[in-house]
């Protein structure tokens, strides 16, 4: 029996089983694509997970080219945005209080 894997036809090979809802979550990486017809093996999913965890450095992966500084700069931008919003809310509250005192 010939099986097609990734565009290649393998002669005398058993066709890999497709993941389905009936296969359950714990078998052969079925949690990745339950019912969607995605073929996943435990070895392949482990290799992908290992490649993601052993990447060089810590980065956000946003394509910004910031490398390890990405999380630091995004954190600083978040703090600056939060400080701006707090100041803006205090200013609005002060204007409302001043208008209430004037009447």
From Swiss-Prot:
Assigned protein family: Belongs to the magnetosome MamG (TC 9.B.95) protein family.
Keyword Hydrolase set for record: no
Function comment: Plays a role in regulating magnetite crystal size.
Domain of life: Bacteria
Phenotype of the disrupted gene, per the record: Deletion of the probable mamGFDC operon leads to a slight reduction in magnetic response and slightly narrower magnetite crystals.
Residue ranges annotated as Lumenal topological domain: 49-59
Keyword tags: Biomineralization, Magnetosome, Membrane, Transmembrane, Transmembrane helix
Miscellaneous field: This bacteria makes up to 20 cubo-octahedral magnetosomes of about 45 nm in diameter which contain membrane-bound crystals of magnetite (Fe(3)O(4)).
Subcellular location: Magnetosome membrane
The organism of origin for this protein: Paramagnetospirillum magneticum (strain ATCC 700264 / AMB-1) (Magnetospirillum magneticum)
Transmembrane regions: 28-48, 60-80
GO cellular component: magnetosome membrane
Protein name: Magnetosome protein MamG
Membrane topology: Multi-pass membrane protein
Region (LG repeat): 60-67
Keyword Hydrolase on entry: no
Ranges per topology, Cytoplasmic: 1-27, 81-103
